């Protein structure tokens, strides 16, 4: 254990979270990530459980968690269909 005046031991770059990584350490941090299919699946699974426990699985729940999912769906679907919608808007006769 560190005494009162000493700094704690530095955390290795691999064990840091994304928000704790400095800009100079970012390329090495990205290269240390697991990009295998199981690693990517695990990252999505951790994100899902984190979102679910923060917004859906709460004592006093509200509609905010589901509303965020629906808002993201609407924004992504609009961004994917924007190219098609833009061409329809520029037509003179429909």
UniProtKB/Swiss-Prot annotation:
Which keywords describe this protein according to UniProt? Acetylation, ATP synthesis, CF(0), Hydrogen ion transport, Ion transport, Membrane, Mitochondrion, Mitochondrion inner membrane, Phosphoprotein, Transmembrane, Transmembrane helix, Transport
Query: Per the record's keyword annotation, is Phosphoprotein included, yes or no?
Result: yes
Stored Pfam families: WRW (PF10206)
Report the locations given in the UniProt record: Mitochondrion; Mitochondrion inner membrane
User: Does the entry feature the keyword ATP-binding, yes or no?
Assistant: no
Q: Which residues carry this modification: N-acetylalanine?
A: 2
Spell out which residues are annotated as carrying N6-acetyllysine: 22
Transmembrane annotation, as ranges: 68-85
* Source organism, top-level taxon: Eukaryota
**Role played:** Subunit f, of the mitochondrial membrane ATP synthase complex (F(1)F(0) ATP synthase or Complex V) that produces ATP from ADP in the presence of a proton gradient across the membrane which is generated by electron transport complexes of the respiratory chain. ATP synthase complex consist of a soluble F(1) head domain - the catalytic core - and a membrane F(1) domain - the membrane proton channel. These two domains are linked by a central stalk rotating inside the F(1) region and a stationary peripheral stalk.
**Name of protein:** ATP synthase F(0) complex subunit f, mitochondrial
């Amino acid at each position: 254990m560190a005494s009162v005046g000493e700094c704690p031991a530095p955390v290795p770059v691999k064990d840091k979270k994304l928000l704790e990584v400095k800009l100079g350490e970012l390329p090495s941090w990205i290269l240390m990530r697991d990009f295998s299919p199981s690693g990517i699946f695990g990252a999505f699974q951790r994100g899902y459980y984190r979102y679910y426990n923060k917004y859906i699985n709460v004592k006093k729940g509200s509609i905010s968690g589901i509303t965020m999912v629906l808002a993201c769906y609407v924004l992504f679907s609009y961004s994917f269909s924007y190219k098609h919608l833009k061409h329809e808007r520029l037509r003179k006769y429909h």
